[in-house]
Amino acid sequence: MKKNLLFFLAASCLFSCQQQDEQQEPSKKTFSFSASIDNESITDALTRSSSTLSLPAKSSFSDGDVISMSASEQDYLPFTIGMENPAWDAIDTDAEAVTFYAHYPELSDDVATRSFGSRYRGITGGKEFLFGMAQAAKGSWNVALKFKRMTVPVILLDEKRQPYEGSAIVKLFLKNKGVQDLFNGKIEADKDAKPEYINIRKISEGILTNLLPQRIKAGETIGTVIVDDKEEPIIVDEDIELTPDTPVAISLYRGRGIIDERTPLRR
């Protein structure tokens, strides 16, 4: 009986010591990720148009989506949301607060090294680029990444502020080559890039066209509208700043167009 009691006490002590060790060593814990996308600007665009309008833009992440993530200035590694629970001891840092950086879509191998020598990469517009950050105390159970859009989605609307489904073909003539800072996600149009024609997709085509952030000056011809085989230039009446995460809503009228109800276009 005494032997059993001693064994029980020894086992209890061992279990208690293990618990204390785990509490004292947060690096041994695993943690999970949650990832969300800031949709405020998209929501504002929808509210100005129609409460029932939905856009083919990335508005949330699903289990199985792959992002590229860097923790504590380390290289970017692919991470599958909802499928992996990394351990804190895999992060080589003594800091109590750890900063995470993430890109979506996943980065290619040639730019996954996080260093000043590979800080920038060239990109082509047209699709969405998202960047997220989070800070968490080492040993936390959850790390919540918040993503923002780094590009400018374009929404084609009709006179009633509904998705445009007419026969007009809209092409914008803007810079479509850019440079991204992989440390903070910021994208700028390449200063040496020449404008090129960019086909603007309708909402019904399943994916929005995304532009690169850039400044457009009043009086510039920024594209064309083709209706019934007739091509008309699109001319900007005021300066426009295309800013990341802020959609451009172009309403097509019979004789003119409007960008975001503020900047008129002439045709």
Where are these regions (language model features)?
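Sec-type signal peptide cleavage vicinity
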Residues: 4, 17-267
